[in-house]
Amino acid sequence: MPNSYGVDAEADRVSLAMIRAYIDAGRPVLGICRGSQLINVCYGGTIISDITDYHLHRGGPGEHLFIDEKVEVLPGTRLAVILGAGPLVVRSGHHQAVDNVAGELRVAARALDGIVEGVEHPTDWVLGVQFHPEDDDGPLEPLYQLLAGFIAAGAPAPEAH
């Protein structure tokens, strides 16, 4: 599939409002790709609107969008608890990324060139990954692990007897 991008300000407005509503309600939030960027913006961070040297992050014009990319999951993060700390090969296809990480968030993963590939809140279950665990051309185990963590975070606490 050739890659292309568009801007939809209304979709961004609605997405930011939904993210903020879930955060304010204390609900878990999992963002993938643009969702990760919007989590950062929601907390006051910024994004890189167009990565100049994109070759690590997506296919070129007319090529498949998603490529294999090696990222480093940082130890001591929620993402490391879910996926394991250290290097991880993921599917990537983006020309934008988190730039300045919002003060309430921390970096959870980085690409080899330093681009932020994961952000999270240190105490609330708010997590964003720039990569695409849902791409079935790559391993699906990271997707299953992320979804299991997300579902567990949203499950009601067991009642004490």
How should each PLM-predicted stretch be described?
Residues 129-161:
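Acyltransferase
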Residues 51-78:
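Anionic-ligand binding region
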Residues 31, 36:
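Glycine-rich beta-to-alpha active-site loop
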Residues 76-122:
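Catalytic beta-strand/loop cores that center a nucleophilic Ser/Cys/Thr
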Residues 1-30, 43-44, 48, 52-53, ...:
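Flexible gly/pro-rich beta->alpha loop and the following alpha-helix that scaffold active-site loops
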Residues 70, 116-118, 128:
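Conserved hydrophobic/aromatic beta-strand scaffold that supports enzyme active sites
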Residues 1-3, 55, 60-62, 127-128:
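Short glycine/proline- and charge-enriched loop/turn segments
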Residues 40:
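Structured adenosyl-cofactor binding patch, chiefly the S-adenosyl-L-methionine
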